[in-house]
Amino acid sequence: MRALVQRVSRASVSVGGELIAAIGPGVLVLLGVAPGDTAGVADRLADRVRALRIFEDGDGRMNEALGARQALCVSQFTLYADTSRGNRPGFSGSAPAEAAEPLYERFCERLGAERGAFGARMAVELVNDGPVTILVDAQSA
């Protein structure tokens, strides 16, 4: 499981022109699920994302975790793209939707995140703050 975590001042997700989720200051998490990922992996990664100290404290140093700030999570199987052969990426490194969706939902629930629409074509808008963008792999969580 991989989480691309972006510190944002705001973010939103729309499907078919309809707004389905929006947050103010917090994190936008693009989440990819791999074959073999488990509920335990989802829980550990969500806890790790929540604990990342990527917000500024009173002294302007990145020293605070998510806390009461908001989170928005979007499923992103393309985080497991394989570009080693030619110019067309392969996605066999990502879990099939029927295995990935319950783990995505579990991760979002544990993180307390608003959600995009799993498997849908979405328009994601964000204002990156910093910018701060961090890739967290479950193997290191």
Which role fits each region the language model picked out?
Residues 124-137:
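C-terminal edge-of-domain segments
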Residues 19-68, 81-109, 114:
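Compact, glycine-rich, soluble single-domain proteins
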Residues 77:
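Glycine/small-residue-rich phosphate/adenosyl-binding loop
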Residues 22, 135-141:
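Compositionally biased, non-globular sequence tracts
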